[in-house]
Amino acid sequence: MKATELREKSAQQLNXQLL
């Protein structure tokens, strides 16, 4: 997996947690 993909996934998880 690409680092960018991991960053996107981690960002989505954080957003979900905040929401």
Curated annotation (Swiss-Prot):
One GO CC term on file: ribosome
Record's keyword terms, sorted: Ribonucleoprotein, Ribosomal protein
Protein name (database record): Large ribosomal subunit protein uL29
Source organism phylogeny: Bacteria, Pseudomonadati, Pseudomonadota, Gammaproteobacteria, Pseudomonadales
Family per record: Belongs to the universal ribosomal protein uL29 family.
Domain of life: Bacteria
